[in-house]
From Swiss-Prot:
Gene Ontology CC: one annotated term: plasma membrane
Keywords recorded for this protein, A-Z: Cell membrane, Membrane, Peptide transport, Protein transport, Transmembrane, Transmembrane helix, Transport
Annotated membrane topology: Multi-pass membrane protein
Family to which this protein belongs: Belongs to the binding-protein-dependent transport system permease family. OppBC subfamily.
Residue span, ABC transmembrane type-1 domain: 140-329
Record keyword Transmembrane helix present: yes
PANTHER family in the record: OLIGOPEPTIDE TRANSPORT SYSTEM PERMEASE PROTEIN AMID, OLIGOPEPTIDE TRANSPORT SYSTEM PERMEASE PROTEIN APPC
Official protein name in the record: Dipeptide transport system permease protein DppC
Keyword Secreted assigned: no
Entry-linked Pfam families: BPD_transp_1 (PF00528), OppC_N (PF12911)
Length: 343
């Protein structure tokens, strides 16, 4: 009997502690969001394009300053003006050949205008002989500065307004939301155009005009999130402990609505880039000779019939830039709020 007791073991008792251990550590909110974001390949590619574009824009400020992109020699405009893109004579689009309107054959414009063989322009030149590649680089940088600066105004006003409206509630919230409805009842483009007319041309004028009326969407998104979070246990506990409203907003509410803020900013930036392009199209953009993507497109429209490449190239850059922000924002939205993508 003693031998039986010695040999007796409880089934399943061995290794019970090891089976109850968690195999992996719990992921934080942002770690889980990054895990979901990596599955969206289009958004991941868009993120890298945006990162490369931002780094390129910063570096280009030292390599291609505005003065270099704006400079031209009036005495050589006939030689270097309106040259088509050229890299090599073997490439179909970048060979320097161009078929003039009404002509049946293509001609080597570089030879016809007496351009030295060593001079090649990857995006061609404008009517003054300025390199479109340099002007596109500067235009990309200016458009990004305008969009990001306007987005910063959108961020500050929209988040502050939304937190105050959602936190206060009641009549204060009702009045603040009616103000937003009044602003949104007028198309943003009309308001931005009128404000740009009052402020005049210039980068700062465009930033103010766009930023002052682009925050309403951000404010509503933040307000809705604050309304849902302010009755949560961790907020009520902070109130009970006597924490100030400002501390609760910064320490508890703002981190929880940060996902919505980032997503909204990513969707606002393409709109701001388009606003700048529209303002430039009606001569309310940056002051000449400074270039932006909008001014380049506006100049290209004037010469579309004869030199379509002057419009096509900046239009492609503008479209790709806007789409990358849209795809990136879409990926962030699905990562931060997977339930929204399932719906």
């Amino acid at each position: 009997m003693e031998n039986l007791n010695k040999d007796f073991t409880l089934v399943g008792s061995k290794g019970s502690d090891s089976t109850e251990k968690i195999a992996k550590p719990a992921l934080s909110f942002f770690q889980d969001a990054w895990r979901r974001f990596k599955k969206n390949k289009i958004a991941l590619v868009a993120m890298w394009i945006i990162a490369i574009t931002l780094v390129f824009s910063v570096i280009s400020a030292f390599v291609v300053p505005q003065s270099k992109a704006n400079y031209f020699n009036p005495n050589k405009s006939q030689v270097y003006g309106n040259l088509p893109p050229k890299l090599s004579g073997d490439l179909p689009f970048w060979n320097g050949d161009f078929k003039a309107p009404g002509s049946a054959e293509k001609t080597d414009v570089y030879k016809a205008q007496g351009v030295p063989e060593k001079d090649k322009y990857v995006f061609g030149t404008d009517k003054y002989g300025r390199s479109l590649a340099k002007r596109t680089v500067v235009g990309l940088r200016i458009s990004l500065i305008i969009a990001l600066a306007a987005a910063l105004i959108d961020l500050v006003i929209g988040v502050t307004y939304g937190i105050i409206s959602g936190w206060m509630g009641g009549k204060v919230d009702m009045v603040m939301q009616r103000i937003i409805e009044i602003i949104q009842s007028v198309p943003n483009l009309v308001v931005v155009t009128m404000l740009a007319l009052l402020l005049g041309q210039g980068i700062s004028s465009i930033i103010i005009a766009i930023g002052l009326f682009a925050w309403t969407g951000m404010a509503r998104q933040v307000r809705n999130m604050v309304l849902s979070y302010k009755e949560r246990d961790f907020v009520l506990a902070s109130k009970t402990l006597g924490q100030s409203t400002w501390k609760i907003a910064v320490k508890h509410l703002l981190p929880n609505v940060s996902g919505v803020i980032v997503v909204q900013i990513m969707f606002d930036i393409p709109s701001m880039i388009m606003y700048e392009a529209v303002l430039s199209a009606i001569n309310l953009g940056v002051k000449p000779p400074t270039s932006s993507l909008g001014t380049l497109i506006n100049d290209g429209i004037a010469s579309l019939q004869f030199y379509p490449f002057q419009l096509i190239i900046p239009a492609i850059v503008l479209s790709v830039l806007s789409l990358t922000f849209i795809f990136f924002g879409d990926g962030l939205r699905d990562a931060f709020d997977p339930r929204a993508s399932e719906d």
